[in-house]
């Protein structure tokens, strides 16, 4: 796994595990790889994966059955989506709008970009309620 300098490795691994849960690779109430197995997969020290698993346990995305291993919590997908939406709406989106303003990017330019990535007019204008 290639890591970015701008974010802690254990958080990048947590994001990867959450992606894998969302994609159905690890269903709810099913076991995920052991710390050592996952450390080997992402090529990091096992202590980094321990920190990742502790972090995900704190978010109630996974839980530990002592002596058996780590399992995906019931409702983990919904929890991940909720956390990611919150981060997007309260951190990523405000930063995006600050950048638009700083770089003086017009709505016409945004509209052109949306057309390039094939987001149709009705989708763009629809309000989410």
Give each language-model segment a name.
Residues 1-6:
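N-terminal intrinsically disordered/low-complexity leader segments
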Residues 10, 34, 70-85:
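Short, cationic-aromatic polyanion-contact patches
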Residues 26, 30, 58-67, 71-74:
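Beta-hairpin "wing" of winged helix-turn-helix
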Residues 31-42, 56:
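A short alpha-helical element within helix-turn-helix/winged-helix DNA-binding domains
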Residues 76-101:
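Conserved segment of winged-helix/HTH DNA-binding domains
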Residues 117-123:
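Conserved small/polar residues in nucleotide/adenosyl-binding loops
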């Amino acid at each position: 796994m290639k890591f970015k300098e701008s974010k802690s490795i254990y958080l990048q691994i947590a994001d990867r595990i959450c992606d894998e849960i969302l994609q159905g690779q690890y269903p709810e109430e099913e076991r995920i790889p052991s710390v050592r197995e996952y450390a080997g997969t992402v090529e990091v020290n096992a202590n980094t994966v321990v920190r990742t698993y502790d972090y995900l346990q704190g978010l109630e995305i996974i839980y530990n059955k002592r002596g058996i291993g780590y399992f995906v919590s019931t409702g983990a997908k919904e929890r991940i989506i909720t956390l990611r939406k919150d981060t997007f709406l309260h951190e990523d989106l405000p930063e995006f709008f600050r950048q638009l303003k700083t770089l003086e990017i017009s709505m016409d330019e945004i509209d052109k970009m949306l057309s390039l990535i094939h987001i149709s007019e009705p989708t763009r204008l629809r309000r989410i309620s």
